[in-house]
């Protein structure tokens, strides 16, 4: 940042008692924003540009910038407390899952028999130079790295093999034994198969799909101790970061991002993929202010793409794993019932509620507390009075706890040959499922769906929140909790891990390596 020395000295005052230096940082930051934007906008105009909701819930007299920071991202099964805009943790398969060998669509043998030749792919850890840490998950960190040959920037997601291969703890095993499993006994091999399947899920899904609102995968490889995914670097940071800094968002902004998220979810569902972990932490903003979904570690892909596989109960039409982030999980997931891709639309309702109100509809110390709140609240979550009727309507339609009454967005997405016939307007029965078209809802009246689904809207327009980016390598829109971390310990060739699981199946990670085509790489660089 460039400031005049006289201006800096003018803002400095000395406290004779404590010998402390006081600086008006808020003014410095505000002036820097104006400097980067090249305009002389007022402070009020800059706040409006960030799309802060005019009716935001007051935060005990504190400005949005002073909201409670997220807790440490160290792995935790359930958060102890979930105040507004505090980072939520996902429930992984080892935390709570219904293990059943008949429900697996990928086995270790399938992984080993992958037709990708490891030796044909030349990328390795030494091809990339670490710049800074962007985030941290249950299995490892996400680093911003630079290609030493081309200087291109990537987001490198690291997954520790030991976390995947080591057997579950006694507590986890006991918890699983208490789950109903249709008469089948759980064992470590089943749990390992499930963890391996989910490890390969993100690599497999991202290597097969391409959508403007979904992060891109360029390379993947592994060494003795870790798996690496080289992903598209999205410099605008997490939606969580912007919510934390600026409070709630206005309805126009929420409607725009709701359209982009739903467009990505609809695309995934047509490809037989259920996302299962929609939350602000997994939504990134690119340089133009458009939203991009990331982190597909908990996603599930049908064995037969979008086709229904009746022999595999855990396909897109019948999933069983208790997985995701409790505050955004559909009730049927938390209750351990069978569920389908419709669970993603409930999560969308939770995310919209969070953006508008400042917290998810239901919070609690664990998933049992949350499900109790959902069951006790027969009328659904309380919708704030200040929201428009259109926004109240879509929230009520998406947040139905009964799947039969929830809006089946995939079925009623847009006009097709089957539903293109005009229908007589009938009064909807109380509690009946919504049958109107999703894309024609009132809150989307300003959205050009053809441009959005084709990707042209993302290329030709700016989103409601355009991140301030002065240097891509600074990662200015990522939390300093992460960017201040050291990457030295995580960016070295580790010694081979020595656990029994490795000796039993030394090639179970074979086939993980991947390299995108040259034309694909040129398209995005």
UniProtKB/Swiss-Prot annotation:
Domain of life: Eukaryota
SUPFAM superfamilies for the chain: Protein kinase-like (PK-like) (SSF56112)
Keyword Transferase among record annotations: yes
EC number: 2.7.11.1
Basic and acidic residues bias: start-end ranges: 172-182
Domain (AGC-kinase C-terminal) ranges: 445-524
GO molecular function terms listed in the Swiss-Prot or TrEMBL record: ATP binding; protein serine kinase activity; protein serine/threonine kinase activity
Any Pfam family: Pkinase_C
Alphabetized InterPro entries for the sequence: AGC-kinase_C, Kinase-like_dom_sf, Pkinase_C, Prot_kinase_dom, Protein_kinase_ATP_BS, Ser/Thr_kinase_AS, STKc_AGC
Post-translational modifications: Phosphorylated by PKA in a TORC1-dependent manner. Phosphorylation at PKA consensus sites RRxS/T decreases upon rapamycin treatment.
Main location: cytoplasm
Compartment(s): Cytoplasm
SMART domains found in the cross-reference section: S_TK_X, S_TKc
Gene Ontology cellular component annotations, sorted alphabetically: cytoplasm; nucleoplasm
CDD domains assigned to the protein according to its UniProt record, in alphabetical order: STKc_AGC
Record keywords, A-Z: ATP-binding, Cytoplasm, Kinase, Nucleotide-binding, Phosphoprotein, Serine/threonine-protein kinase, Transferase
Residues with PTM Phosphoserine: 90, 105, 321, 513
Reaction equation(s) it catalyzes: L-seryl-[protein] + ATP = O-phospho-L-seryl-[protein] + ADP + H(+); L-threonyl-[protein] + ATP = O-phospho-L-threonyl-[protein] + ADP + H(+)
Keyword Cell membrane: no
GO terms classed as biological process: TORC1 signaling
PANTHER family: RIBOSOMAL PROTEIN S6 KINASE (PTHR24351)
Additional information: Present with 1470 molecules/cell in log phase SD medium.
Membership in a protein family: Belongs to the protein kinase superfamily. AGC Ser/Thr protein kinase family. S6 kinase subfamily.
Protein name: Serine/threonine-protein kinase YPK3
Organism from which the protein derives: Saccharomyces cerevisiae (strain ATCC 204508 / S288c)
Gene (name only): YPK3
